[in-house]
């Protein structure tokens, strides 16, 4: 029976291709939802979120199978993961620690006692016949996340700031399910540790929903709790929507921020239309298919999960000081970092500051570089020059190739920008030291300049002097001397003028 559900790579790929095709055909409908939407004053919008977040652990929540996201289907499963009789769970302490980090970061009250419960239902992606979760005694309660000027939403002017704060009802630690591809299942995901973050229905606008999700992504990435990616399923969002305090409707299967927005808009319009026609709304669970929400089940046929405590797992008993100890061990918060990086002396663009926060290694690099090169253009050197050099060569940023103190030395050298770019490119491409790059490119006085260097300089000048190039190619060949003069100036006479003249004529195809 189990083998019938095991996935293969070929089947998974075919399913993914079909999904992509369906998504493309839905594009026009999504755009229509977006352009025609508006809130109606007489129909009050209320929304809450349930965010399922995969924790970045080495092993699964209750087994020693490694966590896997892109490996061959069913290559990381244990007997316990597929529910074979006689197997028992053992809690992964790393997962508990990451869940506690999230609870503290979200200002929650960590519970001294929590425990696991069994949530019973039958579905092929849950081979045990139940999910281990925390229904009765969750790990943490009563948290909040507050918006500020960095979140792109209108800040409340009331003294209590209530409209700026989204309350968090609870955080529970639980196991993920397998992943279904049509009629087959990949159990690599089964048992991966999750936290479910449940908010209160405090959202009164779509902008705040979107801002909260992005702020949450930034937070879990910065504290290295989760990769924070919606597209890969590392974060999955269920949205609860109601109008005029009617019974809530839960929308499942939302995998991108764009789909979150469109699903809310569609569901709000559906509920408003029902009420304007004199109908009534009922509690429902609906699925989002990329175009509309579809009924999955109503209150009348809701699943009775028959929760009860898991007798194979002991209670989690924590020290009263655990929250304080974790809080003091966490790095500077994202909000504090944003405030510091966007103000003097850094004055970073907000987008660049957020980028640094999601990449701890890059943040450390920038701060080490800035400690040496304390100038307003530090931002430009890191983002426009250093990272661009890696990106253009199709390489992942690696601090060992160009260390911050070495980069600061290169930036301070008495060379023009083109020369510094050429040296940086050579270092990244060939993974050589600064001194070696300077020697190989011929920047030392006792070394002969290379043709490669002269060619790159000519290409750079051609790209930045399009009007002169157009004039040359329209028949005014003598205008090439303007380019030669620019090249001589940039290289401070390091090359013979005839070298540049010949290269420009060759690259521009003139005689």
Swiss-Prot record:
Classification lineage: Eukaryota, Fungi, Dikarya, Ascomycota, Saccharomycotina
Catalytic activity from the UniProt record: L-glutamyl-tRNA(Gln) + L-glutamine + ATP + H2O = L-glutaminyl-tRNA(Gln) + L-glutamate + ADP + phosphate + H(+)
Keywords (A to Z) from UniProt: ATP-binding, Ligase, Mitochondrion, Nucleotide-binding, Protein biosynthesis, Transit peptide
Organism: Lodderomyces elongisporus (strain ATCC 11503 / CBS 2605 / JCM 1781 / NBRC 1676 / NRRL YB-4239) (Yeast)
Keyword Transcription: no
PANTHER family listed in its UniProt record: GLUTAMYL-TRNA GLN AMIDOTRANSFERASE SUBUNIT B MITOCHONDRIAL AND PROKARYOTIC PET112-RELATED, GLUTAMYL-TRNA(GLN) AMIDOTRANSFERASE SUBUNIT B, MITOCHONDRIAL
A cellular component annotation (GO) from this entry: glutamyl-tRNA(Gln) amidotransferase complex
Pfam families for this protein: GatB_N (PF02934), GatB_Yqey (PF02637)
A molecular-function term among this protein's GO annotations: ATP binding
Presequence range in chain numbering: 1-6
A biological-process GO annotation: mitochondrial translation
HAMAP family referenced in this protein's UniProt entry, alphabetically: GatB
Protein name, as recorded: Glutamyl-tRNA(Gln) amidotransferase subunit B, mitochondrial
E.C. designation(s): 6.3.5.-
Function: Allows the formation of correctly charged Gln-tRNA(Gln) through the transamidation of misacylated Glu-tRNA(Gln) in the mitochondria. The reaction takes place in the presence of glutamine and ATP through an activated gamma-phospho-Glu-tRNA(Gln).
Predominant subcellular localization, coarse grouping: mitochondrion
Subcellular location: Mitochondrion
Assembly mode: Subunit of the heterotrimeric GatFAB amidotransferase (AdT) complex, composed of A, B and F subunits.
Keyword Metal-binding: no
InterPro entries in the record: Asn/Gln-tRNA_amidoTrfase_suB/E (IPR017959), Asn/Gln-tRNA_Trfase_suB/E_cat (IPR006075), Asn/Gln_amidotransferase (IPR018027), GatB (IPR004413), GatB_Yqey_C_2 (IPR023168), Gln-tRNA_amidoTrfase_suB_CS (IPR017958), Gln_synth/guanido_kin_cat_dom (IPR014746)
Gene3D superfamilies according to UniProt: 1.10.10.410
Family affiliation: Belongs to the GatB/GatE family. GatB subfamily.
């Amino acid at each position: 029976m189990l083998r019938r559900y095991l996935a293969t790579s070929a089947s998974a790929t075919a399913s993914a291709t079909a999904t992509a095709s369906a998504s493309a055909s839905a594009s026009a409908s999504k755009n229509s939802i977006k352009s025609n939407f508006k809130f109606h004053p007489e129909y009050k919008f209320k929304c809450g979120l349930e965010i399922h977040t995969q924790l970045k652990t080495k092993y699964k929540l209750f087994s020693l199978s490694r966590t896997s996201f892109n490996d061959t289907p069913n290559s990381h499963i244990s007997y316990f993961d597929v529910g074979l009789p006689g197997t028992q769970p053992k809690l992964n302490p790393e997962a508990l620690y990451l869940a506690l980090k999230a609870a503290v970061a979200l200002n929650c009250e960590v519970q001294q006692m929590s425990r696991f419960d069994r949530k019973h239902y039958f579905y092929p992606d849950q081979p045990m016949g139940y999910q281990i979760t925390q229904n009765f005694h969750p790990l943490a309660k009563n948290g909040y996340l507050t918006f500020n000027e960095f979140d792109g939403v209108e800040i409340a002017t009331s003294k209590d700031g209530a409209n700026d704060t989204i309350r968090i009802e609870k955080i529970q630690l639980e196991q993920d399910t397998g992943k279904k591809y049509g009629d087959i299942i990949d159990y690599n995901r089964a048992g991966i540790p999750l936290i479910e973050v449940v908010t209160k229905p405090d959202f009164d606008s779509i902008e705040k929903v979107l801002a909260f999700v992005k702020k949450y992504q930034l937070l879990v990435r910065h504290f290295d709790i989760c990769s924070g990616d919606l597209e890969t399923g590392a974060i999955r969002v269920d949205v609860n929507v109601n109008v005029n305090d009617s019974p809530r409707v839960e929308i499942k299967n939302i995998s991108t921020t764009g789909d979150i927005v469109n699903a809310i808009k569609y569901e709000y319009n559906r509920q408003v239309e029902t009420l304007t026609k004199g109908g009534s709304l009922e509690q429902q669970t609906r699925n989002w298919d990329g175009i509309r929400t579809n009924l999955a089940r109503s209150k009348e046929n809701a699943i009775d999960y028959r929760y009860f405590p898991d007798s194979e797992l002991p209670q989690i008993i924590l020290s009263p000081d655990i929250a304080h100890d974790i809080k003091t061990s966490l790095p500077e918060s994202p909000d504090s970092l944003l405030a510091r990086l966007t103000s003097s002396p850094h004055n970073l663009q907000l987008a660049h500051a957020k980028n640094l926060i999601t990449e701890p290694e890059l943040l450390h690099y920038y701060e080490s570089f800035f400690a040496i090169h304390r100038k307003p253009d530090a931002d430009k050197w890191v983002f426009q020059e250093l990272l661009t050099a890696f990106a253009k060569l199709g390489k992942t940023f690696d601090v060992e190739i160009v260390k911050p103190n070495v980069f600061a030395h290169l930036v301070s050298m008495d060379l023009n920008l083109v020369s510094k770019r050429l040296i940086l490119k050579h270092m990244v491409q060939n993974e050589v030291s600064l001194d070696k790059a300077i020697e190989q490119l011929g920047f030392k006085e006792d070394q002969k300049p290379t043709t490669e260097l002269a060619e790159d300089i000519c290409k750079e000048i051609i790209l930045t002097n399009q009007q002169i190039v157009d004039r040359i190619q329209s028949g005014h060949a003598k205008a090439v001397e303007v380019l030669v003069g620019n090249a001589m100036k940039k290289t401070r006479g390091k090359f013979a003028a005839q070298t540049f003249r010949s290269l420009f004529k060759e690259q521009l195809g003139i005689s």
